Every structure is written in structure tokens, then in C-alpha cells.
């Protein structure tokens, strides 16, 4: 992740987000892309902070950075959102669904993001990118990852032409919530955003909710009774998204889920490698490598048993 700082000045409060120091993997930590996408979304139905300035001069603080608005609100880390009641939880999940559908309905030409990524063949390109990054940061042999990569290569659906702006890390704790209302005031952490397939974002969020409850930053709802919490089932959440976007049916759902597990595992491997090399921004980074194998195993279980 990119180191983030809260700045208090005479003129107000701001947030500075910069690239981490040290040697970086190619295309990782693109704070300039984060700045560009949030700036482009200012007047859309996707809530984002106001952007102030991107500094590409690495001599100022040691790496590229940008300054954005400080949003006063709430961040929730636990997918079960124990801090609120059932009615609020139901409303919050519906709000996340609404914002995701709004994001995928953004006219990328109108907001100046038509060249923000390569349109088409998203999963093929992503498989290439994350397989390469996984190999570059591989520390030891993990058979489940080998099996998963082989399955994804052999079961990739034909490109259906769907292209939208995708966030790339769309989940509860990457949103700033209104101080009292079940309303998103800012979607944050856009470093993985690009032009891609909208179902990648939807499957990624659903994948996260399949995680164990004690998944650290990736705490999910595995084993929890969603109904008793006022949280929709995966099927209900997907259905609500489809209704918002006028989609009849989703084919190949198990592929999209399995791909999400793979990509997250590849990202985790990169974090673990940076920790080993001494470049990670979080003290917890070294432990992240331990999730790679379980993620690949969960994906293979979906593949074997169906979504």
C-alpha cells in the first residue's frame, strides 16, 4: 500500500499519499493514476475526495505524492460491521452495491478516462500481469497456486466486450462513511484501478465476504449467519447489482471468483517479498505471505465444487 499522512495546516486538514521508498515493482504504487482517476470522478455519482495537487518531483519528499481533501467520517474493518444495528447494516450493504453499480456506469469517455487502460481482453491481460508479478516475488513453491494458475488459463471465458472503470480493491474498508448515516462519502485506495471488466470488482467484493472472520484486513463473513445480521447473501447482493445495471444473468461466476482469489494471492506474495527485501510500508507485511496458500486453496475449492 502507499504510505498515507494526515496533514494539519493553517488553511485546513489534508491527506498526503506517496509512493513507498525503495525499489518498486514495475507499475505498482501508481499514485499518479490514483490522483487522475479520483480527479476525473469529481462530478459523477461515485463519491471521491477532492483532489488538490499531484507532485511528480521526487526530490520534494523522496517519491511521487499527491494532496487530497481530508474526509471526516467512519471506516469499518470488520465485514460484519458490529458497530451498527441490522437496519444500518442492510442500508450500508445496499449503499456499497449502489456505488459499485454507479462506478461501472461511469461514461469513461465523458470523464476523460478513455485511455486509462486497454479496453478488452481484461482477464487475459490481468492473468499475464499478476502471473508475472507472482513469479517476480515468489519465495517458495506453492502447489495450490500452480494448480490455480493452470485452471484459470484453461477456463478463461471468451471476452464478452464489457468494459468499464474498475476500482480493483473494492471493499468495505476502502470507503469513508458519513459520520452518522449509512452513506459512502468517499471511495479510497484507487491504486489498482483501470479500464477492465466490471464483474472483476463484483467478484472481488464477494470473494472478500467469503473470507474467514479473522482474516486481518481481509476479514470476511465465513460461517456467519448473514440473515441474522441484516446482510444480503452473495446471491442477493449479485442480484441487486444486476438489477441496478440491467443485467439478466452472469455466466462463469466461478471463474470470476477464482480469478479474484488468484489476484489477491499474487498481491499478497508481492507484499511478502517487499517485506523480505525491507521495503514494505506496514509492519504486518511479512505475515501477509502466509495467506497466499490458503487463498489459492479456497479458489480451488470453488473450482471443484462450483460457486
Describe every region a protein language model picked out.
Residues 200-245, 259-278:
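Active-site activation/catalytic loop segments of kinase-like enzymes and analogous catalytic loops
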Residues 87-89, 164, 190-196, 228:
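Glycine-rich "substrate-gating" loop/helix at the edge of Rossmann-like oxidoreductase active sites
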Residues 66-69, 98-101, 105, 128, ...:
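Generic alpha-helical structural context detector
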Residues 117-118, 248-260:
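All-alpha amphipathic helical-bundle segments outside canonical DNA-binding/catalytic cores
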Residues 1-165, 178-182:
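ATP-binding pocket architecture of kinase catalytic cores
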Residues 266-307:
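Regulatory N- and C-terminal appendages and interdomain linkers associated
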Residues 176-216:
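Catalytic activation segment of kinase domains across protein kinase-like and atypical kinase folds
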Residues 165-167, 172:
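Catalytic-loop of the protein kinase fold
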